[in-house]
Structure formats: C-alpha cells, structure tokens
Amino acid sequence: YKGAPGRECEQANRLDPEGIRAVHRAYLAAGADAIKTNTFGLPRMAAAQDPEWEALADAGWKLAAEAAAGTDAAVFADLGPAPDTEGLSAAQVYTAVVRRFAALGAKNYLFETLSSDTGVLDAVRALRETVPDAFVQVSFAVLPDGYTREGQHCRALVRRMADSGLVDAVGLNCVSAPGAMRTLVQQLGQVGIPLSVMPNAGYPVVTRTQVQYR
C-alpha cells in the first residue's frame, strides 16, 4: 500500500478507507485466516494525547471487520509499542487502547514489535475484566543476538509472558530475518503456550533511492 494520505499510516482509515479495505481483502484472497487492524501506531498516538486516536481506532476496526465479514478469518486489534510519557504510563496507554477495542467488540489482540513488556500485563489484566475470553498474543522485536533495542533478552520476555497466565500466545517479529529468527526460536525451546514467528523478509539495503530487502 503506497501513497497513504496523512502524516500517520492510521489516518488512511479515514482518508482512504477503500484502500485499507483492499489491503485486507488481498490478504484474505491470498488465504490468510487472520487479519489485523491498521492501528499499529495508536498507542504512540494515545500517549501523545492525539485527539484523533479514538476515531482512528473505530475506523480501523470497522474496516477490518467489514473485510472479514462472511469469512472464517479472525480479526486482531493491532497495537504497537506504547512509550512512557510524563503524563501517561505505558500501562495506562495500552489499557485505554484495549478498552476502546473491547467496546467495539474485539476478541483478539496483538501487541507487536515490542522492545519491552512494560505495561503489557497490566493492560491485559484490565482487558480480561471486560473480555475474559479474549485471545491475546504478544510479540517482541529482537535483534539476531537475542536482545531488543532496550537491552532485554527475548528469553526473559517470552518466559514472563508464558508464565503470566494472561497471554495466549507469545513470539518474535520484525528486525530479524528468517534464518536468525529460526536460531532464536530454537534457543527458546518449549515455552508452554503457542509460539508465533513473524520474521522480516530480509534486511534493508539502500540502493540509490530504493530500499530492498535481501
């Protein structure tokens, strides 16, 4: 999806809804049995107290749900990293966002590309008060050496999620290419809950004015 209008990708939910629907439908046509809302940046927007974030959450959920209607595909409310700010903690931000999605009817939640687990379990506890049967997946962005950009090792992060009793699936995504991620997963071993793996297609290489993954 190129040429997204607005300063944030999520703004396309309102400025180009048909374009976002087309992306969802393309995944479904390719055989996807789950899609995620175009809302990765909402926690960051909520932390900055951007007045648009709630409307973008609503629009993002509606577009994904409409695209999946009439299929067996699951729809995941997608949440990227939430920063701690002077005004709001990561836990407060995540909690506000998941409660918004819960009010819209979301049953599946994906916290992804995280460098730490700060605030995640607090938000999941709050979510389960409203949606006790929610499916929650948490995924960390880990470098090939096993550490996130905040210096936390994936083994400790995955173990905390698996041992919490609050998370249904845990895993790794982004940053590392398939070979490196395979090695990390082998090092993790059995974790007791389903393990998700979503590697990068490769590593970005800038050639003149283009970015290619190799």
Feature roles, as predicted:
Residues 1-214:
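Domain-level signal for soluble alpha/beta catalytic cores
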